[in-house]
Amino acid sequence: TGKDGVVLATGGFGANAKMVQEYNTTGKWPDLSKTGTTNRFSASQGDGITMAKDAGASLTDMEQLQLLYLGNLVDGQISKFPARDVNGTDQIIFINKEGKRFVREDGRRDQICGGVLNQTDKMFYILESGDGAGYKDIKDPAWRSGDGFTFEYLEKNGFIVYADTLEELAKKLDMDPATLQATVDEFNKSVESGNDEFGRTLYSTKLEKGPWVATPRQACVHHTMGGVTIDPEARVLNEKGEVIKGLYAAGEVVGGIHGANRLGGNAVVDTVVFGKLSADTLLADTK
């Protein structure tokens, strides 16, 4: 019934395009009103933040928005792709529609997304070869993507482009084969020398043999670092810094936990720690 208190754990607002654009004020990102999201559309609408604000809660870091470059081109979800299941980050490169690299693949999320948004049609391909000890044959009938899809489904629906040779792949992607080959050759030189034109430092193998897989991706709104302000015990605070009695919060609905650029995986710790802490505090406050 909430008579003793309420814990807000309603998530962020990454799937609410209007709200995202309202707080997109730092100049870091272009207009995001039509940008996809990796969040489920029925969730991450910012409802909890809005309700808390109506109850007098202070908001923190609402302008801090994180994008992720792994959204598929259909609905923006981090799904339906073999990348990193076939090979790790150290064995892939990112290419634009012209067949050229444009960013360090082991860079920060915001830097990669900024690069993606400057490319033709604001998209790119994750390029993988048949090299590397971790390579998996995605045409094997037993193979499935991380979310359970077969090679046939992914290829038929355009989630991946597959070819036995790099030249064949370039033609399927409507790229100049010579340009794509030159891009791969230059990267392979970087693997040998350890000096990359974009500053990449993570390598493990050259890209030399087929089959080749290109996975089209886009930068999408992923995490919203802003939300309600809490004290160290997860009590929600008002604009004067005073505790709003009986109101607690945990997870992405809270602002000020991750700063301007959340590190991947840190939100898991955030939800676990403050989820327990908010419940413990509520119980302690009602004794």
Predicted regions and their residues:
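Glycine-rich phosphate/pyrophosphate-binding beta-alpha loops
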Residues: 67-72, 109-113, 220-225, 253-268
